[in-house]
């Protein structure tokens, strides 16, 4: 009986204000269904002070409203394809008292390049996917790490298509592979400054971005049928893993890709 009580106590403490006193920057919030928003919600729940970015006027109102609902301290524009916006990001963060966590949830490829065979990927389409989905992580880490004087955590989101061939993922899978390699090199560069860099490989989740992948519903069905847990992962489960990695509980983890996919990635034939 005493053992059960101790376990409950630990579980209670685990989910109690794990990010209190920390400031977190979340890039990539697009709408209420985005994984970035789920992570921002979880960070707010755990006591983090939030900074959110949006890309372009089309998303400004939506992200500002979502930021207000979360009590975000700042909501500002950052287009990661523009060097002037990245320079402005550095300036904005410099005015903050501290920065403890960064979530990079940004990826894009032309729908045509996702749908066509990889061998037919255009040069421009390849470079676009790499620039937005992989290089932006390097640029954001450079801008943010200059303010992370007390150490911290930088997170990004990836997918199984980085190491396995996923139909209709194509050029994005290659971009995610580059992103995961970038995580390892960034972890090596920033580790001496006590800045941890990790990626979360989330299972398929119904987001607006996922609708751009042909036959995405079939991917969900396949995972549900074959994952050890016989279901798909939820945005909240991905967000809770992000909380762990951003908190002091994850202080010994860096340079890694952690899966939140109901175990699907372990399965063979």
For each predicted feature, which ranges?
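Short, small/polar-rich loop/turn modules that mediate ligand/substrate recognition or access, typified
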Residues: 191, 196, 253-255
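A glycine/serine/threonine-rich, flexible loop-to-helix segment
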Residues: 64, 192, 202-227, 237, ...
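Conserved SDR Rossmann-fold cofactor-binding beta-strand/turn motif
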Residues: 196-206, 246, 259-261
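Short-chain dehydrogenase/reductase
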Residues: 4-125, 212
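Catalytic loop of short-chain dehydrogenase/reductase
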Residues: 28-37, 107-145, 150-192, 204-206, ...
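Short C-terminal tail/terminal secondary-structure segment
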Residues: 243, 254-269
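A conserved structural motif in NAD(P)-dependent oxidoreductases
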Residues: 227-238, 249
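Aromatic pocket-lining residues of Rossmann-like dinucleotide-binding sites
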Residues: 43, 190, 245
């Amino acid at each position: 009986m005493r053992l059960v009580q101790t376990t409950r106590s630990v579980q209670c403490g685990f989910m109690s204000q794990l990010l209190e006193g920390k400031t977190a920057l979340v890039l990539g919030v697009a709408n209420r269904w985005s994984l970035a928003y789920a992570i921002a919600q979880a960070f707010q729940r755990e006591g983090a002070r939030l900074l959110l970015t949006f890309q372009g006027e089309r998303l400004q109102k939506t992200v500002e409203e979502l930021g207000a609902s979360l009590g975000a301290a700042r909501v500002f524009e950052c287009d990661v394809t523009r060097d002037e916006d990245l320079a402005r990001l550095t300036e904005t963060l410099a005015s903050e008292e501290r920065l403890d966590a960064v979530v990079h949830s940004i990826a894009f490829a032309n729908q045509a390049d996702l749908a066509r065979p990889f061998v037919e990927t255009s040069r421009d389409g390849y470079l676009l996917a790499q620039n937005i989905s992989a290089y932006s992580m390097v640029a954001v880490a450079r801008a943010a790490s200059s303010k992370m004087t007390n150490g911290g955590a930088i997170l990004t989101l990836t997918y199984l298509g980085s190491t396995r061939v996923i139909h209709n993922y194509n050029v994005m899978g290659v971009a995610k592979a580059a992103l995961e390699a970038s995580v390892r090199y960034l972890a090596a560069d920033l580790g001496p400054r006590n800045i941890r860099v990790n990626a979360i490989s989330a299972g398929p989740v119904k987001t607006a971005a996922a609708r751009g992948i042909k036959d995405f519903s079939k991917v969900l069905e396949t995972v549900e049928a074959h994952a050890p847990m016989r279901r798909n992962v939820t945005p909240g489960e991905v967000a809770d893993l992000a909380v762990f990695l951003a908190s002091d509980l994850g202080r010994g983890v860096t340079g890694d890709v952690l899966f939140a996919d109901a175990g699907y990635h372990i399965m063979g034939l």
